[in-house]
Amino acid sequence: MMKPFDTHAHIYDKRFDADREQVMEASFRELDYIVCPSENLESSQKTIELVKSYPRLYGAVGIHPHEACHATEDILASIADLAEHNHKIVAIGEIGLDYYYFYSDKETQQEWFHRQVALAKDMDLPVIIHDRDAHGDVVRILKEHKDTRLRGILHCFSGSLETALELIKLGFYISFAGPLVFPKSVHLKRVAKEIPLDKILIETDSPYLTPPPHRGERNTPLNVIYVAEEIAHIKGLSVEDVIFQTRANALGIYQIEE
C-alpha cells in the first residue's frame, strides 16, 4: 500500500534535538517522503545536512516572512547557492507574507517575497508559500509573477474557497495541515470538499499545529495520517485514495522521481 507524503515538516527544529533520529526512523516506517522547508540561512544550512542523512527526506531553502527584516543580498545569494548545488533541494520556501505577527513590516516582507519568487522562477523551482492574514497581497504578488515557470504550494491553507480557486488557476496546490481536523474549521472543510483532489497536498507543519487526538503535544510527520483521514471523510473517499493522489501530487510539484 502507498504511504503518505508529508509535504511540510520543520525537522531541524530544536524541539527534535533530543530524539530526531528516533522520530525520523518512526516516521519513515509509516511515510514514504517528507519535505523540510527552511526559514532563514541557518535553518537552510541545517536542512542541507539533514537531507544528506535520509534518502527520502527532501528540502527547501528560503527566507520566511518573520525573517525578512534580517534578509540581505548576501543571505539571498547564499540561499540561491545552496539550492543550485544540492539536488535534494526541491523548492524555495517557506516564503510569503505574515500580517498577523508583523515581525517584519509589510514593505520589507513584500520586497523579499518578490525577490524569492523571482529566484525560484530563475531556478525553475516551485515556491512554498506562507500566507497568514495576507491572502489579497499574496495573490496579487503571485499574479504579477505569472508565467509558465510560476508554480508552487500554498502551505497550511487558511483562506477562502475563492482564494483557493484563484491560486489553483495560477498553478498552485493547496496544502492542508492539522487545522483541517479541528472541529471548528468549518470553512476549511468546505474548501477541502470543493476543490479537486488532484490539487490537494497534505502536511503536518511539524512541530507545530498538532491535530486531534494529539493536541497539546509536539507534532511529528506521523500525524499526517489524520489530515488524510479528514479529507477522505469530507470527500467521501477512501483514505487509500487520498494518500495515493496527494502523494502523486507532491511527487509532481516537487519533481521527485521514484
Locate each region found by the language model:
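Mid-domain alpha/beta scaffold segments of enzyme catalytic cores
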Residues: 1-258
